[in-house]
Amino acid sequence: MSSLASLTEAQYGLVTTRQAELSGAHRRDLSRLVQAGVLEHMAHGVYRVAGAPRPCLTELRAAWLQLAPELETDQREVTHGVVSHSSAALMYEVGLLDPLRWEFIIPPPRRFRTRRQDVTIHRARLTAGDVKWVDGLLVTTPLRTVIDLASLRFDGGHLGLVVADMLERDLAHPGDLSVALAPYAAAYGLPGTTGREFLEHLTDRQGQRTSHAAHR
């Protein structure tokens, strides 16, 4: 454990089998530590230090580590996988989402397959400006997150709540959101609508829902 201490501390108590091996540990060492109650098995090839503070969305962190199990957190770049879509919204604590799957973007040309039924891999191009570090994870920016959700025709009510929360918390500028949302207005049944009008439509719906709920 002494050889893994700095690594697990930097990764919120998590470590992959490959990272441990590169640090000088062996698979049998990890098995012994699990049997001794020192480590907990989180996911295939991912362990957590028992008793360590359990950070928010630990399962999401474990799934992200699986995307490039040989790399430590500070060695990862956009090409190795980024938290995205509904999972990114969870990281920003916007909307009222309870997704059944963890979502990531892995830009081409890299290919990655997973057997996990609770993980969805999207293939899309990303620039350095599309991502940021959030609590030790590479995550799509709030603006890019909205674009990704809208491109999948994410439920309008939920998208509106995500956008409204971002505006309320100053996570995104309304002008930038208007420009980003403009190409998707027609897909949401509002052809000929400007991005600003679409944004107002989404946020007005949330205001109406809140008002109705308050009068019930």
Sequence positions of predicted segments:
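Short gly/ser-rich loop at a beta-strand->alpha-helix junction or flexible surface loop bordering the NTP-binding
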Residues: 1-148, 152-216
